[in-house]
A protein has these predicted regions:
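Short beta-strand/loop element within the Bergerat-fold HATPase_c
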Residues: 141-151
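Conserved micro-motifs of the catalytic ATP-binding
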Residues: 72-77, 110, 114-117
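Short helix-loop "hinge" at the ATP-lid/N-box region of the Bergerat-fold HATPase_c
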Residues: 133-134
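A residue-level detector for a conserved hydrophobic packing site
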Residues: 122-123
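Conserved DHp (HisKA) dimerization/phosphotransfer helix of two-component histidine kinases, i.e.
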Residues: 11, 24-101
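Glycine-rich/acidic phosphate-handling loop/turn and adjacent ATP-lid/helix
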Residues: 155-174
Length: 240
């Protein structure tokens, strides 16, 4: 194994989870997880087939402890208002990435609803919440809708016949926690607008809808396969 990678892991595990070390801890975690494939290959021996996963688990535990530390400044972060059109375009692009191997197009029908949160967190959370439904519904016309409010996050997925069989593949009630966990991993706590403003997007996944805006993206299946990235781990309700 490259000595530099071992050095980074050792350095990370030696740091105390304090506000003073927060920047270095996050930087090291990102660097280590960016080389996770390399770590798996180099530790996948007959004697220690799980060594790489254990190392990454230790690194993630360090990040969780930092996120749960009351002294950390990330507990007090907030996000400014973002433009709805730009936010929704990002959601469309990322969702289309999930569908690119099926050669399907994504259409978006906008609704003017205000939102006060970080756009990248909404994009990541939406991708996670509907990815399973999309993955197991290839070849169907699916409609996915996401509603985020001050106290709730609800995801609904239906097929072209109006049946909600795909809904069983996701857990709507865990949505808000998933969003919050992602926010914590990215250095903040998601705070919705105090007046209860919410974000709502209705999307239709089809190749022949008569209206809407069409977006294209190249194949990106490796994103879904890399379940050990900090973002994916944070989205799976694994935070303490």
């Amino acid at each position: 194994m490259p000595y530099s990678l071992l050095q980074k892991i050792d350095r990370l595990l030696s740091l105390e989870e304090t506000a003073e070390n927060e920047g270095e801890i996050r930087e090291l975690v990102n660097e280590i997880f960016a080389r996770s494939d390399e770590l798996y290959e180099l530790t996948a021996t007959a004697s220690e087939p799980e060594r790489g996963k254990k190392m990454l688990s230790q690194c993630l535990r360090k990040l969780r402890t930092l996120n749960n530390n009351k002294e950390s400044a990330l507990k007090n972060c907030d996000y400014s208002f973002v433009e709805l059109d730009k936010l929704l375009e990002g959601v469309c692009l990322c969702t289309n990435i999930l569908l690119s191997e099926s050669d399907m197009n994504l259409f978006f029908i906008p609704e003017k609803v205000a939102v006060s949160c970080c756009p990248s967190l909404i994009v990541d959370s939406f991708m996670n919440l509907i990815s399973n439904a999309v993955k197991f519904s290839k070849g169907k016309n699916i409609t996915a809708s996401l509603t985020l409010g001050k106290r709730q996050c609800v995801v609904s997925v239906t097929d072209s016949a109006g049946e909600e069989d795909a809904l069983s593949l996701i857990r709507p009630k865990s949505g808000l926690r998933s969003v919050q966990n992602t926010a914590r991993l990215h250095g903040g706590r998601l705070l919705f607008a105090s007046n209860g403003s919410s974000f709502s997007a209705r999307m239709a996944l089809s190749a022949d809808l008569p209206r809407g805006k069409r977006y294209h993206a190249p194949p990106f299946s490796s994103y879904l396969e890399n379940r050990f990235s900090p973002v994916h781990l944070g989205l799976c309700d694994c935070m303490d």
